Amino acid sequence: EEIDKEKRGTQITLFLKDPEEGDQDFTEEYTIRHIVKKHSDFVTYPIIMNVETSEPIPENEIIRGKDGKPIGETYRKVKKDETLNSMKAIWAKSKDDVTEDEHKEFYKHISHNWDDPCEIIHKKFEGVTEYDVLMYLPSKAPFDMFRAERKHGMQLYCKRVFIMDDCKELLPEYLGFVQGVVDAPDLNLNVSREILQEDRLVRNIRKNLVKQIFSVLEGMEDEKYIQFYEEFGQALKAGIPTDYDNKERLASLLRYKTTKSGDKYVTLDQYIENMKEDQKEIYDITGENLASLLNSPLLEALKAKDYEVLLMVDPIDEWVTQSLPEYKEKKLKSAEKGDLDLEKVDDEKKNEYSALLSFLKGKLESKVKDVVVSKRLKNSISCLAGDEWAMSAYMQKILKASGQKAPDQKRALEVNVNHPVMEKIKSVFESDTTNPVLTDYCDLLYDIAVISEGGKLDNPSRFSALVGDLMAKSI
């Protein structure tokens, strides 16, 4: 139908129902402002609304009394047009045309952070499909980084029109801390979470975004990367069990302190470069803190061989070691599990202690699966070690602390047959196998092993009494 109009263009009139209780009122100024700001802040055309505001009455229009004071109101209500959208889509600009201050302002706008970004990734992808990408690597980790309900930082736009935030389909879970925008003009607007997961364009975008992030991280200067890693290293580690395609590349980004590095971090590549000629495996140990790991009896034989050991103190490291059995053809080997195979046990010593070891095993059968001559110990008297595929002591501790049931598994008690105390225990055993003090020695050997790994004793009072009794006898 043809109509007469003063101006060219399309006019759309919406007729709204009266809002029911609890519904949004789309005639309210605040609601309209919020919708425009969220969905259309960056469209290239101005969105104008006629709003009511207050302005001061001009001086020559104010009525004053004899005392010179104004009579009546000094402000009046006026209607005026106001542009609601900023139209500043900095991701659509050329990289060189965006200033550092503009980046800082936009980063704070989308992230709600007060700090400046650590790195900026601003790129236009061209080819069969085109899309603009602007991503920021934060400087500080959010307090809720590992909460399941935490929102992802990526927003999805189509031709500058907001589609969705918290867009988990654009980046894998472990990179959810990255803040930014993807504007894909060719995106199907009939979009939903389910459709996005299957969308070929979105999968392609995701793949390229991950590549870009890795390239930036790999190109960082060491000092800057360490600052970033101390904030987000645990997030990168979380990608090892979940991102099979990028596992090797993620592993190259990991950093660990070692038995030789002091306060410095070491990469897996640097570790391999520093390996001894006769060393075949990458050794690691997990635990609560560096101090306890550095002094762990489990490392004595490795230190004696001058082998370096990775010290893993983040809970997520337990999943890293399970999901990363090897790196660049070098097997990762736990210092507390399986046979370290560093040296052979003296057969003569083994036979010499076999009766005592069988006795100890019988006394401790409710706590350990075996009692064996240790290949790990050089100075300490005892330690606990698991099978090759057993759960580590730290992993069991993590599960218990989180309220989960840890599998009931027994480990082997390893004893140092070259320790002078073991020689005395053997002497007592050979003199009288029924001597009640042997039971005390059994309990002490086990309790010492538990304490040395930071474990909790079942009966600390008995341990204290036994130690006190031994001290009294030795004085």
Go through each PLM region and give its residues.
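Conserved GHKL (Bergerat-fold) ATPase module
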Residues: 1-475
